[in-house]
Amino acid sequence: MTKDMTMGSPLRMILLFSVPVLLGNIFQQFYNMVDTIIVGQYLGEDALAAVGSTGCLMFLVLGFANGIAQGFGVMVSHAFGAKDFKLLKHYVALSLILTAIVSLLLTIPTVAASRQFLILMKTPDNILGLADSYIKVIFAGILLTMSYNVAAGILRGIGDSKTPLYFLILSSFLNIVLDLFLIVVVKLGTAGAAYATIIAQGVSALLCFIYMFRKFDILKTSREDYYLDGYGVFNMLSIGIPMALNYSITAIGTMILQGAVNIFGSSVVAAFTAASKVENLSTQTMPTLGTAIATYCGQNLGAGKYKRIYEGMRKGFFICIFISLAASAICVGGRFIVSWFVSNPSEEIFDYAMQYLNTISFFMLPLAWIFLYRNALQGLNRGLVPMLSGVVEMVCRIIVIAVTLNPFGYWAVRLASPITWLFTGILLIVTYFIWEKQSRKKHSGSSD
């Protein structure tokens, strides 16, 4: 069912919307973790390092695609909040057209150049072939991955955060079965893990679209809704492209970090891969809050209810404190989780993984700020600064690694993300409060 976030308690609306999104994010991480666990346990340390070494490259490309998809969802939330259902149907149709175009434009060059990208990232020779086998399949399935994110974004834009969860849970179990079959039985190696992932996401996307068009009359499109118009395309891409570029720019900085990790050899790569999985697991509440706040701000902006936006953001700030404390606790206690990903891990792997996790545990609050304020600004049609914040992230990582890698070694890896989060979080907080101050002045006479 739809959820109108322009009425009722802001805190209650945000939390109720967030719970299914959080469960969905956890399940998405879950089947990503299953890939990693099965690869590590059945294919060994080199295969685990190979899959892990592709993470930043995947984030660069899939982050761009999914950033555009999220932008489509924001525009849907604006139309839904304004109760303009004719425009809403056109945005749904336009989302499907643009998804097909963007997927095609991304798939061809990335599949062709995947090996060259991995070489540029200094991927160790002993895992290069395994990494390329994995990433080529992932890139070939961009359409399936992006389609699920578009369908989920549309449903969340009208306040339905439960339906994407149900189909994602189903596809998660499918992913586990396919992982075991393709890796253990068919013996496709790292490529088998990639096939399992994209097939599972494709099933989830298909079921989402079928349900969406059958269940919600306001989303049922007709032939007259499918056309490319300059105004509609501009509106969709003016939000989607900054969100996409933000993901990709951030990913470039992360790729530089991965390149620094790769210098230390496959054991450190495996340790960093496992530690990154713990980090991702511990921070799942943060993108969840970001998704909820983007929809909340988008609907209330469309409805012209600015006071609700201010109130919701205050509640979001306090939520950040609680979720950052929980994330820190998981990181500090992450040694047990690290053991899930590597068969018979050496003490060296544990040591490198925990060094990283203990360091980042002190900086979880700035990371939570990034998700809260970046998504709020995107939901408010202020996409430029969130995109520039990605540039700040990239530059910070480059500077930290360039200055500290030679004299301090692995400390460069440990410090790059925390320092980046601190500077980026402050930038986004300042930008949001400038917008709020201007908005309060502009709408001071409004009851909303």
Predicted regions and their residues:
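Hydrophobic/aromatic residues in alpha-helical transmembrane segments
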Residues: V19, D35, F72, A113-S114, ...
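Transmembrane helix-bundle signature of multi-pass secondary active exporters and lipid flippases
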Residues: V21-V74, I138-T145, F234-Q299, C320-A327, ...
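Helix-loop interface residues and adjacent transmembrane-helix termini in multi-pass membrane transporters
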Residues: M33, Y42-E45, A79-A82, G157-I158, ...
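Small-residue-rich hydrophobic transmembrane alpha-helices
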Residues: L48-I108, T145-P164, A271-R335, L367-S389
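Hydrophobic transmembrane alpha-helices of multi-pass small-molecule transporters
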Residues: L60, N175-L180, A205-F209, L281-Q284, ...
